[in-house]
Amino acid sequence: SFGGQANISKYRNMINVKEIRLIPGNHDDRLVSLIKTDPLVRSSFILCRDINMIKCHGCIFILSHMPVRDDIVDKLLSGRNIDNTPVILINGHLHGSKYPDNGFKRYFRVDASIETNNYLPYNILDIIKLYNESEYI
């Protein structure tokens, strides 16, 4: 993920945030292993589950590496009182490729792979603006 263990601290120190929550992807096996075994690397990241749900700025965000199918989202939201709360799915993995045709249509989604935003991180407020400008409103 970082071009080798020696680069982890260098790149981590370039990211100006207090915490980095890592949702592991298919290229992160070595990094996950280091987080579990190396105290210095462990202090740089918070290792998260494959699918994470947070509420922020009045929206529900479902964060994952792989895109999450609609039926799985339905199960995640089942029994929750969300009323008309916007639900926004953010994933990586696709690197700008299209979402599959089946099972990925009912929720607003953002492929947050770095290739989709000029190799810059997305701002959560920009994602909410995209949602507000979409047909999912």
Residue ranges and their predicted role:
Residues 1-56:
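Core catalytic region of metal-dependent phosphoesterases/phosphodiesterases
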Residues 21, 39-137:
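Conserved beta-sheet core of the metallophosphoesterase superfamily
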